Amino acid sequence: MAKKGKKYQEAAQKVDSTKFYSVEEAIKLAKETSTVNFDASVEVAFRLGIDVRKNDQQIRGAVVLPNGTGKTQRVLVFAKGEKLKEAEAAGADFVGDSEYINKINQGWFDFDVIVATPDMMGEVGKLGRVLGPKGLMPNPKTGTVTMDVTKAVQEIKAGKVEYRAEKSGIVHAAIGKVSFDADKLVENFNTLKDVLAKAKPASSKGTYFKTVAVTTTMGPGIKIDPSEVRN
């Protein structure tokens, strides 16, 4: 295992690995312990009491964070006719149909999110083996397969983030940048937490929010007191 650098070691010394912090404390500490020379992302990890092998316990969705993510998302929209014009007017970076399918097949990935109208999914679905592993396949659960392309594009541009529980039941998501005021990050954190709480499967028994941690890009992990997020 590679040894962590000096900056990381110094940052890690500011974090008490035996302590559970309040949400506010953890986020302030995450900002203080960022070790990189760019505006790092602030990320959270919720370990949930779910079994994703069960169909009714697979958690996936999207939420618009009130203060955005600080990241500019490049949006590609697959649509036809008037929907192309709507997507363009809403601020989509790329709009089209078959020509972009051909470009993707040739290795083009200069975008972050795909939105598609339902009538385009027959064609877009053929890209499953290319888009699926990259997490780029549009999905109705995240609002990226829709006839309302205007709303979809505007929400993504406003700071919409997708979330999905991994095999271990962990949901990772970025809630902003180190440059954000701490209270803005706390507000984004609470918005995501509330959405995850509402998404709790009825069949999930026992503790739902098992562990919660916050970190920055390449920064140390900071544990949050689970009692602060449990309903």
Curated annotation (Swiss-Prot):
GO biological process, any: translation
Residues forming coiled coils: none
UniProt keyword Cell cycle present: no
InterPro entries per the UniProt record, alphabetical: Ribosom_uL1_bac-type (IPR005878), Ribosomal_uL1 (IPR002143), Ribosomal_uL1-like (IPR023674), Ribosomal_uL1/biogenesis (IPR028364), Ribosomal_uL1_3-a/b-sand (IPR016095), Ribosomal_uL1_CS (IPR023673)
Gene Ontology CC: large ribosomal subunit
Protein family according to the UniProt entry: Belongs to the universal ribosomal protein uL1 family.
Subunit structure: Part of the 50S ribosomal subunit.
Name the record gives this protein: Large ribosomal subunit protein uL1
Organism annotation: Macrococcus caseolyticus (strain JCSC5402)
Lineage, top ranks: Bacteria, Bacillati, Bacillota, Bacilli, Bacillales
